[in-house]
Amino acid sequence: MVAINSVSNYLSLLDEDQLELKSYSLEKLDSCVDEFWSEIASSSIDKIKSLSVNKQFPKHELASLVLSKVYYNLSDFPNSMEYALSAGSLFNVLSKSEYIETLLYKFIDEYIKLRTSTNKDTVINPHLESIVMGMFDRCFKEGSYKQALGIAIEARRLDIIEKAISQSGNVNSMLSYCLHICNVSVNNRHFRHSVLGILVNLHLAQEKPDYLSVVQCLIFLDNHIEVATILLSLIKKDEESLLLAYQIGFDLFQNSTQQFLLNVRNRLPPVEKKSTTTTTTTPASDSMEIDIDSGNEKSGGSSSFEQRLERLHSILIGDVSIGMNLEFLYRNCSTDMHILQSMKTTSELHKGAIFYSGTLFANALMHAGTTRDTFLRSNIEWLYKSTHWTKFSAISSLGVINKGHIKESKSLLKTYLPGASVNQTPYSESGSLYALGLIHASHGEEIIDYLVEKLHINNAILHHGASLGLGLAAMATGRDDLYEDLKSVLYNDDAVSGEAAGLAMGLVMLGSGAKKAIEEMLAYAHETQHEKTIRSLSMGLAFLMYGKEESADTLIEQMIGDKDPLIRYGGMYAIAFAYCGTGHNDALRKLLHVAVSDGTDSVRRAAVTCIGFVLSRQPEKCPKAIALLAESYNPHVRYGAAFALGIACAGTGQRDALEILKSLTTDSVGYVKQAAWISMAMVLIQTSKELVPEAETARKLFATCISDKREDSMSKFGAVLAFGVIDAGGRNSTIQLHSPSGHKNMNAIVGIAGFLQFWYWFPMTHFMGLALTPTSIIGLNKNLEMPVFTFKSNCRPSLFAYPPETKPSTTSSTNKIETAILSYSRKNKLQSSRSAMNIDQDVEKKEKEEKEAKEKEAKEKEEKEAAKAEEKEPLFERKSNPARIVPRQLQYVQFDDARYQPIKKSPAIGIVMLRDLTPNEPEQLVVKEKPETKQETVGNQSGTATATASLPNATTTTSPTLPEPSTPEPFEFTE
């Protein structure tokens, strides 16, 4: 066949009058347009256009197709798409050519844009709709169901979503994939709920529904009625269904709010509360087992159902989860006490309370949830130094240490809790009420009434602790009566009590979006003159917007447009709470705009910080978004950039984030370094030097910063807190803003946001305790007991091992003080030494060479030993129940126990219900290590976690209680 060098002959046929010749010309041009498009475009494009628009011409669609291909080769995609739509069926979506594939992507993008447009008058071209539907048909024919599902989700086509899942042939896999995509990619809350509704219906239509996934969808939909119905039906069936019901209960407690759990329990049949004769129990789990595990289930009958129902209620209340976590954290506590003692020693060398408070906070975080207060009891004299608000922080730290010890909370704090009226120790009493809130955070049914009672005592300092405690205990309950009680405290117009009341009102109404609360809080924020109160109300308003997404936009616009920078500050957190984890572009755009344009440093700092919340589900994107802001001339922006990285990349050990943070640790401004240290610890929490080499380096940097006399005090405070964060919960807890199933971790999000307010008020540091999640897998049998079982971790133990303990310093304290030498003595020694200098030079040189040789030999020996140890290290290890498993270790876990298998297909961190494969054999249970709770005397050093009577209180100390220092007189500052 002769090669064609030109299409001029075909183009000339377009001038003929006969339609057949014109049609023939277009057919030939269509076959070679990709090669001769430039010649066609330069001479005959207008002629082809006239044929395209002439509907009387039989080949007008072919003319449009030729034009589309010409414009495609000219890279004029809008015109190419326009004429492709006019080509009708000639634009064959089944074709695999580059032209078809490219325009299909363009058409799909345009279709998605039109489908998601907020303009109600938007009309979609029927030809465009036809092409996209053809694309869906092509996907179904080729078996590309996931591709069709992805396009359907982006285009918001619910009918195609349902069709893609139901026709896929692997419905369960597609349902899981759709749920994941829905949580990660769908920004519109209303549409996401519509998709979740379809998933629930498709799940329930299966022969064997996956009730675990169904309940996850129902939690997102806030449908407690359907959840209760499923639970009730499951506990009436066989043992397999019972285990599934218990597992669903544990997942509900982990992923839903207090109010949702209460609603579910109210829909279940009630159970009679049994009186407990035993009062000196251990954690909540022990008392629970005494009540409900007194015997095996009876076969059939109402007693068996009642026992199952009682256990289900205990799971939903949280007694089992909290008790098991307490047991795990207590028995596995691996806190390095040398670090704490070193910090305490260093704090004694510094004036002021900042380092002293930092050590208290670090100790609380290191022992969070472990119930171990050994460090406090062994340093009583040091604790006696605390006065006023430092004493408040010291007592409230017990709440972090004993987090979750709900059964014995009042006994633990009995020494400090207030009576019917205020005595001479309001700071201790207020701190104890705050501690109660920290112990009962998001689980405060038993303590709320007590805190309300103390809220009625007329004392501003007591109101502060009681308000914070009540807000934490009643978090997200949405109770109007508690809101009104706190509002009455707010209206006292006192800065101390108002600061706590504003935050507490937001915590109680967390995520409710209540219009009444918004109007009242915003109005009072504009009326009051107290900056503390305005700021706390702004944060409270942000709490109300938790998870509201687009519904929060009206309030957000109102807050960020306010003249008061304190309200704009709260507006940044309103964006963070409304869009946490969504990666929403509009939210990020607003935050970035404020970060570079607002005239107030605190607002800019908050805006940059809140980027971390929005990107918390996509940590890999945060370093890129923050990189330039971390180099800003404004130190407040750099501070915010550091915390944004810490929040978004918490527990990931991400190297890009660590590189930016490492550069910020050498910043010239103390508080920027403070943020960098803390954020570095957040990123490196639960990582080992084998997995992330920077983990070991970071610990050394923290220690160096603390011991360096020239280091800024704010930087040192950050390094102290960093040690507390990186070793949190006895090195058995991590920071997770989202659960593996995609749910937001409400406690963690609120905890970190509250913790960040330590910039203004140090006691808010304790909120970090809320953000900590135990990293454990705890297996339970049908009686909610821990059986002895093991599973395999298919990786080297060192990858996820505890960091080695630091060695105590052997340097004596006298070495720190140099002997004073007079100048004339130094001169005499210098003159006498010069004569012997030449002789000594050779000796010194020889000694130096010998020293270097020894150091080299020692280094080689260490390397050989390390290599030898690495060779001997096993490739896997067996883990025993309850086991420490960090999030990144889950992928290596294999459940291969001969007797017990998890009811879940892919168990996550937390409590796992176990199926007993040999139920007729006797079970061996794990022996509890937690000692009985008893009140200890001052001199008792038994090591029990409840010997709090030995902690400092104003009624037992020898130092007098000093009055609170008065406010300085007004003055004018002139440079």
Curated annotation (Swiss-Prot):
Cysteines joined through disulfide linkages: none
Biased composition range(s): Low complexity: 944-961
A GO cellular component annotation in the UniProt record: lysosome
GO function terms (MF aspect): endopeptidase activity; enzyme regulator activity
Gene3D superfamilies, per database record: Leucine-rich Repeat Variant
GO biological process: proteasome-mediated ubiquitin-dependent protein catabolic process; regulation of protein catabolic process; ubiquitin-dependent protein catabolic process
InterPro entries attached to this UniProt entry: 26S_Psome_Rpn2, ARM-like, ARM-type_fold, Proteasome/cyclosome_rpt, PSMD1_RPN2_N, RPN2_C
Positions of the UniProt region annotated as Disordered: 272-303, 832-882, 922-975
Entry keyword annotation includes Repeat: yes
Record keywords, A-Z: Proteasome, Repeat
Signal peptide range in chain numbering: none
Ranges: PC repeats: 393-426, 431-464, 465-499, 500-534, 536-569, 570-605, 606-638, 640-674, 675-715, 718-748
Origin: domain of life: Eukaryota
SUPFAM superfamilies: ARM repeat
Biased composition (Basic and acidic residues): 842-880, 926-935
Membership in a protein family: Belongs to the proteasome subunit S1 family.
Function: Acts as a regulatory subunit of the 26 proteasome which is involved in the ATP-dependent degradation of ubiquitinated proteins.
Name assigned to this protein: 26S proteasome non-ATPase regulatory subunit 1
Gene symbol of the encoding locus: psmD1
